[in-house]
Regions:
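Position-driven detector of the extreme protein N-terminus
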Residues: 2, 20, 24-26
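Bacterial N-terminal signal peptides that target proteins for export
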Residues: 2-12
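Bacterial N-terminal signal peptides
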Residues: 11-22
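Glycan-processing catalytic domains of CAZymes
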Residues: 27-209
Length: 209
């Protein structure tokens, strides 16, 4: 691929699904694998401009045959609007591309990956609303690696008590995944499938739940 082609505007993360047995490209598709891409909320939000979406996608689709695209609905407190999500879905469906949702539960990624505080009532409400918002638009969505917490607010310290941070956060994130994400999403859309992609960068991430 020509390194000069600017695809970083879309900031895509490419997942190769299935085992890659044959890397030979075909005119219309690939024989031995499918390709999915993940688009951050920042770029999904830009899809409100159909001309931006069309021109950007033309660059990408000339270089890569895409089967599925994950459209992120939230990152860093940016929630993509309903109309933008529906327009983006239609754009890709019209081109034969499957769509799914994605969520990154961060407050401010640039601030040392600032996460939600999952014992904070206001944060819990936001987490649930984001899950419901996403389930309304998609029958499948994936939680990005940032579904963890490093929060040490007064609320969290009090809730932790005498537990270790690891034990406390493991229980907290299990409860949050079940009661703030899965159950509310299923209530909005009984058919929805939620994929939790647990952080796998370092073994120490278990300390963040």
């Amino acid at each position: 691929m020509n390194s000069k082609i600017k695809v970083d505007k879309f900031v895509i993360v490419v997942f190769l699904l299935c085992m890659v047995c044959n890397m030979t490209m075909q005119a219309k598709a690939y024989e031995s694998f499918k390709v999915s891409i993940y688009v951050r909320a920042y770029e999904v939000d830009k899809m409100k401009d159909i001309h931006w979406l069309d021109s950007t996608w033309n660059v990408i689709s000339q270089q890569l045959e895409v089967d599925k695209i994950y459209l992120e609905t939230h990152r860093d407190l940016l929630v993509v609007e309903d109309a933008t999500l529906e327009q983006a879905k239609k754009f890709f469906h019209d081109r034969g591309i499957e769509t799914a949702g994605g969520i990154t539960y961060t407050i401010n990624e640039a601030n040392s990956f600032e996460t939600f505080c999952y014992s904070n009532p206001e944060h819990r409400k936001m987490v649930q609303k984001i899950a419901e918002h996403t389930a309304k638009h998609f029958d499948e969505f994936i939680l990005d690696d940032f579904f963890f917490t490093s929060c040490k607010s007064d609320i969290e310290i009090k809730a932790k008590g005498m537990q270790s941070w690891t034990d406390y956060r493991l229980k907290l994130m299990t409860e949050a995944g079940r009661d703030l994400v899965l159950k509310p999403a299923k209530k909005v859309n009984p058919q929805v499938k939620v994929i939790i992609k647990y952080p796998n960068w370092y073994e120490s991430y278990r300390q963040c739940g």
